[in-house]
Amino acid sequence: MIQNSAGYRSLNTASPMTVQVKNQKKICARCNKLVIPDSQRTKTTLKALGKYYHESCFTCQDCQKPLKPKYFPYQVDKTSESILLCQYDYFRRHNLLCHVCDTPLRGLYYTAFGYRYDEEHFSCTICATPCGVKKCFMYGNQLYCKYHFLKYFSKRCKGCEFPISDQYIEFPKGEEIHCWHPECYGIHKYWHVNLAAETVGLQYLPKLEYNPNSGDKDINPTAYELDKQMQAFNFILSKTWSVLYRFEEEAASCISDMFQYLTSNDQLKGIESTGLLVLKIDCLFRGLDTLNLSTNKSMPVNSDQECIENNAMAASKYSKFPKNLSTKIMIYLQLLRKLGTENKNETITISSFMSVITGLAHFLKLLTRFGLYTALENNKLTHSVNPLLRFLREVEKNELFENNPFQYIKTPVNATDSCAGCNKYIQEECIQFYEHRWHIACFTCSSCHKNINPRSLTDPTFNKEKKKILCSHCSIDDPASVPGFKFVTKLAQLIFLLKIALVKSRTVMLKSKASNKVGRNSLQSTMLKEQTYIRTLNDIKRLRSRRESVRVTHNKQQARKSVILETAETDLNDPTKQGDSKNLVIQTDDPSSSQQVSTRENVFSNTKTLTLDDISRIVAAEQARELRPNAFAHFKKLKETDDETSNVVPKKSGVYYSELSTMELSMIRAISLSLLAGKQLISKTDPNYTSLVSMVFSNEKQVTGSFWNRMKIMMSMEPKKPITKTVFGAPLDVLCEKWGVDSDLGVGPVKIRIPIIIDELISSLRQMDMSVEGIFRKNGNIRRLRELTANIDSNPTEAPDFSKENAIQLSALLKKFIRELPQPILSTDLYELWIKAAKIDLEDEKQRVILLIYSLLPTYNRNLLEALLSFLHWTSSFSYIENEMGSKMDIHNLSTVITPNILYLRHKEISNDNVPDEPESGLVDSFAQNKGENYFLAIEIVDYLITHNEEMAMVPKFLMNLLKDVQLQKLDNYESINHFISTVMQSKTIDYSECDIKTPVTVKDSTTTVIQGEINK
């Protein structure tokens, strides 16, 4: 017995280690009551984490279950407090419960899709097959093996209709969301071709509905058959995309270099780039030749006659493109040679060879598409994938040529392009014997004069000394004659002619360079042009990468494998270990592919590569720079020590309308309207003034989604608008919201919302021959136009297959769509302002006013106009090719036929001529109502907009500066903004220098002289 200072005695029942705390009172940490030892020891005192507990109080903090004999200490987050938990709640708080059986994970477990599984339940819900670490799929919060996931639950690709096993792109289109394999989306986007099962020699895999009571025996297909077919398809898909996209990048790089060196007057580098392009085109032509062979020889007797006829029609339609492409290269070489002989006081303008560079990219694009399309059609006819693989194998060889093209071009300088028989030019298929070539018609026996079959060339011989062709019968009498004839296809002959032109041009340029010395000023001018071009190139790459970037989603996920090595479990029956501090220890395998997944979250966002579609944008940007040198003065005059980064003097804002928020766009409209009012171009007494003011902030309704705004609309007593069920004739805002798509057809870095029909039409037309005469002028087949219209109206979210139509038909359909819009794209409310702008004499002031009016356009109108103007500018580059070829539709002619569809007034809207009894439909006869004057002024406006489409898409710098000032003043309504702008205009502090014209630049083409927006006939 031990007596304490208070005179109380207690029984020493503690261990020797606890004798020192005998005199302390024991308070229960749970109920805060005194712990009194029971003399009969029916109740024990428990100690954990340095605290005492009644036995009845020693329970789990979460579920109140008794913890004796084992407990788990758990430290509360962001505190130093530790609580006692049972095993289940301890693992629950650590998120270590199996997602399937809801039991604590002990030992090995797996993490996938944000859930954890024990080893037993990390398996397929249907067949219980263990899910591999790299092969786990989830649907409806349940795991499945690859076989059952692909068979029953996987999304289907919009392009190929195969199940999506891993990566896919979600692409909103109208009210639907389409899923694509990234490669299928790329192939469709760049060449408008889909890889269906029948086009790659595989069977279609239908999506089955899972029924647990069906007793499915895992057949049709079996797991092995499905896996084998998916592997085959993925190989074909990956091969097709990688080879053709790589070819497009390489070809685009060559054409870009050709453009750069032509503008910077560098002949030798230009000829090197051209030689490299010809070698790559040679690979494409060889691939096309394999398709012709497979078409002629490999088709089975029972082939689908319709498919054969379609192939023949496609071959006929595309037959002229190789010659057009080679002609463009010949013209380029002619321009390049001209640089050495051109008068030093004269320069070759970009507009003079715009069609050459744009045409090169376009015809090469068309031939690539034709090759892919034909290969897939041949696959369908032969029920195999061999035609496609042969085509890709030849095209892939272009990657062997990286530089120094003339080490691969062995054509001698004295090579001839004439027939050895008639001495006439050979541009078609022919017969070759070493350096000699003959037309097919000239390939006759020199002895018996019989025609020799060009397809059987093993028997005929050639006498080199006498230069005689001998047939198989006559060659017996001439032992000196030897065989060796080869059949040369039309495509191979075109390449041969290009190589002759390359070698001869290079020889002339080398001699010219040896005799001419380049001056210091010429070198500086070349450096300046190269730096300017590189800046344009980088801008185009950056804009395209941002505009086309698409986020990738994953079906499959690599599971993370983990093992629990230690927990904080404590046993009350083992007092020797109660003082040990134990923590939760988990060992986790780091998945090797986690970095790879993160780097592929966005596709089509590479800023280091070019595509053929970028070429036309580069040409347009450089032409705009040539037309407006002051507005695009990015560099000061070069000094010897200057570098690129120190010379940038931006005259443009660099901000595109598509990048602005809705509120910023509304403020821009308010600023522009105030500036126009300040210039007295519009006043409060004008009939359109009220509608223009209301239009300034009108677009806020489109994006404002607060509860009270929605309630205000719902409670409105105004009658609801009729539900639009058709595309043609529907309001533009309704089309964009209901059947719109975020398109990359704009100029800026951000996708723009336009109707699906416009996106499909323009994308399809970019894959067609735009040099056909009368594009946008002819009306096409009226009956077919009505059929297409009815088809589109009946299914607005899915455009028909436009690849079966011709360019004339689609251009007429596009014109019909924009003509039938209830309001013209350039807005009825702005019509008078456009006409007033055209009447302004001073070019500087006219440009400023046009920029202001353009900024007033409603968002969807401007989006559609941006895509349309860019496309029309590109279309104009095919107006003239050579020898009276081409569409004849230059910018002026395009403006003439497009203007009545986008800038006009209807009967009801013409002042002093309201006739209530007449129908509102139909356009005004401009000559009768407006004496013809406004008609030509409207054409001049549209001509200007097409010519300067790149500039129009960008917010003027003076407007951006005023926008910043308005935002600093926190002005948010038209009245306050108008007052502020009036004050600024009175102070005359607005910088309009980007619109100044110091030196007019004249750009001449076949029919039109454009002088800074002025058209001289």
From Swiss-Prot:
Gene Ontology, cellular component aspect: cellular bud neck; cellular bud tip; cytoplasm; incipient cellular bud site; mating projection tip; mitochondrion; site of polarized growth
A GO BP entry is:
actin cytoskeleton organization
N-acetylmethionine: residues carrying this PTM: 1
Question: Which region ranges are annotated with the description Disordered?
Answer: 570-602
LIM zinc-binding domain location, by residue?
28-88, 98-148, 155-184, 419-474
| Keywords, alphabetical | Acetylation, Cytoplasm, GTPase activation, LIM domain, Metal-binding, Phosphoprotein, Repeat, Sporulation, Zinc
Q: Which residues form the Rho-GAP domain?
A: 730-953
State whether keyword Cell wall biogenesis/degradation applies. Answer: no
Any further remarks?
A: Present with 468 molecules/cell in log phase SD medium.
State what this protein does.
Acts in signal transduction. Activates CDC42, RHO1 and RHO2. Negatively regulates 1,3-beta-glucan synthesis. May be responsible for the down-regulation of CDC42 during mating.
Can you state the subunit structure given in the record?
Answer: Interacts with CDC42, RHO1 and RHO2.
Query: Which named protein is this?
Result: Rho-GTPase-activating protein LRG1
Gene label? LRG1
